[in-house]
Structures are given as C-alpha cells and as structure tokens.
C-alpha cells in the first residue's frame, strides 16, 4: 500500500480540494483511461457498480481506507460504490464527488459583494436533484478554514468523510451528498489554521434540534401549502403609515403553559388555537412575537440567536410555525417579529469564531463584544455579513409571510 501524501490529506482530514483526489480522474494509461477513487475507512472492501456492467472489485491503496480502480475507458455513466464493512454488512452509495457543485461564480460574487439579498436560496442545506439523483447540496462561508466537512449520523459524525471543496477566493465551501433528505441531522466540522476542530451549526440552517442538542436539521422550506392569499393580497393595498396598528407583544414560551406544574410549552399549533382568538377579542390588529429564531438559552427570551433561519424547535417544526402565521392571517391578524441583528451569543456551536477567526464579529473586542450582555457584535463592515443579515430579514418575509 502507498503512503502518498496526496492521498493522506484525505485520511488525515487536511484536504481543501477533495475533487482533486476523489471521484473520476485521468490516468497514466492515456486519454482512454480513467481512475476512480473513494475513501471508505469503515469498509474492508469496495465494489464499483456501473450501469449495465457487473460489479468490479476496487483496490485498497491506503491503509486508512482509500480505494481506487483503473478503467480502460472513462466512466460517463452514473456509478455507485458497494461497501462491505468489517462486520460483513453492506451498503451502496453514489459518489458525492461525481456531481457538479451548484454555486456559480455569480452566486459567489454576490455573496462576497454583500448584494445577495436571498443567499438562503444557495447557502446552507438545499434539497435538490442532480442528474436524476436526490440529495442535499451544502454551502458554507468559512474563508480562513483549513478544511471543512459535513458530519452527521450518515457518516458516523466522522469529519474524514465528506470534506467540502473550497471555491477559491469567495471563502465558500460546497458539496452535494446524495440520498440525504429532510429530517437528517448535520453539522459543519471546521479545521482551523491552528489545527483546532470546531463543530458548528449551519448559519443558514432551516431547522435545528431541540436544545441542549445543537445539530442542524435538513428541511424543505417549500412544502407547506399556504391559505392566506386573501390576506397577502389585501396587505398590498394598505398604507400602513396611515392605518391604525395595535400590536400585542408576546413571548410564546411564557404567555401560557401546560402540564401539571406549567412545565411544558404550548406548540405553535396550540398557540394558534388559544392566542389568536384572545388577541382578536381584545381588538388588536397584529401580534408582535418576541424572537422565535433558534436560541440555546430559555432565559434570553430569544434575544441571543444561534439559528437565524430556523424557528425555534421548542414549540414545534418550521411548518408548525407557518401554520401559526397562516392562521393569524386567516383571522385578519398581522404578524410582526422582533429581529435580532445587533448581537449573537458566544456558544461554541454558533457564529462566534466560526472558522477559528473573528468572521461574523469584529476582531477588536472593543467593537466586537457587547459587555452588558456578554455577546458578540456583528461586523457590519463585512459584505458577507451584510448579505447574511439582509437575506435573513427577507427570508422571514418571503418564506414565512411575516408582515
């Protein structure tokens, strides 16, 4: 077996350009020859399965689990790997490194320029189909990282699997993972320049685990069927500078509880049933929600946000929150959110020192820390940070119909 440093950069978790190592490559055999390579540390053997051909055994070329096979002609058809584990269990997967990345140079430029107001359509975890294969395309901004991987139950939370490809000067990393679907847990594992590992929640994640767990959750934001078309059409004709507004401000976690000792939160759907008629009977026109974005600390009332694009899972799923907004609108009640672009907490899984450096925050603590709250302050001078925050405001209006 070889000890090629080129291959070892994958197994030791330092590779920033895995497409240069894994997948299909030219071979020394000439123009009519290709090499397919895969890193499978939990497999004792790997077979290559091509359409219309019998499985072919791949050769283990590195003790840490690198397999490869040379083919006489380039593999243009889709192929899969069939792995057999050390316990003789087998599983079959498409090769992530056989799929094209989905961020164009324009996409990268707009984020870097700070003018992409809907970066949530490209960044984070995007469910999609590429070449007839369903999966999730991931993208994250971490310009000072040495290596970024996607980790989850699907790869035993092992950062040697699924290293992402750095996309040059944009600082964005990307990778498509076939077969992942809505509900799958994931994080980004980031190796910084000092050699330290960081497990981070997705800044653009659409859903999150219930605290104290901190993984992001793949979620399809386009499946909910809205029934508030009448409200949406009506609000376009209203001059809110002239119309009277009476807003009922409420913290969903404390307005009303259930359980023998009031220890349980109401769900978004239960709140829709109880809160909306209560507010309507009092004559209010709007409900103003204290922050419902994902946050680790109950006592912060939501004002220390980690998941800016995820409704807190304390009260249910993202679609449950859409149901709450939908029901408000059908009852003629507008919904306003308290939004927190001023600061964020120092929790290790959050935005702070995201790639081992002051990325979303100021490096100078005199500008980057809110002493009264013990939180970080956004660096509004960075284009990518402005794109993140503006996209977040647009996200809640576009996808959750916030007023």
Where are these regions (language model features)?
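Beta-sheet entry/capping signal
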Residues: 33, 135-137, 147, 285-286, ...
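Solvent-exposed serine/threonine-rich low-complexity stretches and specific carbohydrate-binding patches
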Residues: 54-63, 160-168
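Substrate-binding/active-site clefts of carbohydrate-active enzymes
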Residues: 209, 229-247, 251-402
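The feature marks proteins involved in alpha-glucan
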Residues: 1-30, 61-142, 167-249, 254-263, ...
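Short beta-strand elements bearing conserved aromatic residues within extracellular beta-rich modules
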Residues: 46-48, 148-150, 186
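Short proline/glycine-enriched turn/loop motifs at strand-loop junctions of beta-rich domains
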Residues: 39-45, 141-148
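Glycine-rich, histidine-containing beta strand-loop boundary motifs that form or position
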Residues: 38, 50, 152, 161, ...
């Amino acid at each position: 077996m070889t000890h090629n440093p080129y291959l070892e950069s994958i197994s030791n978790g330092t590779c920033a350009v895995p497409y240069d190592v894994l997948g299909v490559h030219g071979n020394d055999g000439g123009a009519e020859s290709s090499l397919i390579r895969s890193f499978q540390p939990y497999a004792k053997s790997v077979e290559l399965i091509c359409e219309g051909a019998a499985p072919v055994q791949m050769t283990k070329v590195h003790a840490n689990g690198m397999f490869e096979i040379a083919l006489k002609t380039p593999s243009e058809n889709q192929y899969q790997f069939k792995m057999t584990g050390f316990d003789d269990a087998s599983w079959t997967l498409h090769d992530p490194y056989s799929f094209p990345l989905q961020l164009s140079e324009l996409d990268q430029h707009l984020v870097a320029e700070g003018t992409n107001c809907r970066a949530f359509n490209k960044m984070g975890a995007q469910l999609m189909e590429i070449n007839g294969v369903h999966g999730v395309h991931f993208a994250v901004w971490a310009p000072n990282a040495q290596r970024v991987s996607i980790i989850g139950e699907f790869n035993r939370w092992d950062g040697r699997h699924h290293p992402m490809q750095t996309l040059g000067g944009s600082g964005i990393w990307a990778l498509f993972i076939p077969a992942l679907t809505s509900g799958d847990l994931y994080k980004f594992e980031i190796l910084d320049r000092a050699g330290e590992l960081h497990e981070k929640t997705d800044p653009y994640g659409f859903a999150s685990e219930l605290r104290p767990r901190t993984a992001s959750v793949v979620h399809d934001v386009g499946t909910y069927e809205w029934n508030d078309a009448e409200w949406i059409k009506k609000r376009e004709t209203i001059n809110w500078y002239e119309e009277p507004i009476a807003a009922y401000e409420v913290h969903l976690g404390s307005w009303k509880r259930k359980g023998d000792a009031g220890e349980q939160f109401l769900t978004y759907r239960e709140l829709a049933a109880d809160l909306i008629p209560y507010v309507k009977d009092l004559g209010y026109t709007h409900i103003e929600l204290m922050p419902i974005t994902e946050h680790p600390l109950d006592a912060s009332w939501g004002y220390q946000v980690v998941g800016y694009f995820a409704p807190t899972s304390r009260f249910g799923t993202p679609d449950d929150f859409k149901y709450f907004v939908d029901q408000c609108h059908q009852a003629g009640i507008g919904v306003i959110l308290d939004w927190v672009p001023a600061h964020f907490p120092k929790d290790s899984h959050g935005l702070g020192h995201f790639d081992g450096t002051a990325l979303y925050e100021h490096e100078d603590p005199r500008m980057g820390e809110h002493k009264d709250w013990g939180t970080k302050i956004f660096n509004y001078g960075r284009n990518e940070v402005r794109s993140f925050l503006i996209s977040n405001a647009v996200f809640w209006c576009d996808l959750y119909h916030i007023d």
